[in-house]
Amino acid sequence: MNFKYIVAVSFLIASAYARSVQNDEQSLSQRDVLEEESLREIRGIGGKILSGLKTALKGAAKELASTYLHRKRTAEEHEVMKRLEAVMRDLDSLDYPEEASERETRGFNQDEIANLFTKKEKRILGPVLGLVSNALGGLIKKIG
């Protein structure tokens, strides 16, 4: 009879442990879902900010291009305009990253693809912002 009690108590302990493990797994999966939703929201906000920044840069570059389009330019200004045109092409390529890098992303999972695009945006936007600020600074000095 003692053996039956030992088996019954062991079974109760094992089932309680299994339930606690299952509850832990559920709470972890719920935390993962919440973290993933938070990351999506952050990426969405970051995407909107980048989109606004790209639009502003495009507008500034187009305005500069139209300002200096009809007057005689020096060689230095011509070089600045070429750089601005290259910046515009880079910004346009950011609008359609799937087409631009379709071959690179085959075989990657979704996280790797998201990280790849984020790295590409940082790699392109950093020099682009520097180039635009240098070009604007140089043009403002010449005007003033």
Swiss-Prot record:
Keyword Signal on entry: yes
Modified residues (Isoleucine amide): 143
Matches recorded under InterPro entries: Bombinin (IPR007962)
GO CC annotations, alphabetized: extracellular region
Propeptide boundaries: 19-43, 74-123
Signal sequence coordinates: 1-18
Assigned keywords, A-Z: Amidation, Amphibian defense peptide, Antibiotic, Antimicrobial, Cleavage on pair of basic residues, Cytolysis, Fungicide, Hemolysis, Secreted, Signal
Location within or outside the cell: Secreted
Domain of life: Eukaryota
GO BP terms, alphabetized: defense response to bacterium; defense response to fungus; killing of cells of another organism
Keyword presence, Secreted: yes
Expression (tissue specificity): Expressed by the skin glands.
Family according to the record: Belongs to the bombinin family.
Purpose: Maximin-3 shows antibacterial activity against both Gram-positive and Gram-negative bacteria. It also shows antimicrobial activity against the fungus C.albicans, but not against A.flavus nor P.uticale. It has little hemolytic activity. It possess a significant cytotoxicity against tumor cell lines. It possess a significant anti-HIV activity. It shows high spermicidal activity. Maximin-H9 shows antimicrobial activity against bacteria and against the fungus C.albicans. Shows strong hemolytic activity.
Protein name, per record: Maximins 3/H9 type 2
Annotated organism of origin: Bombina maxima
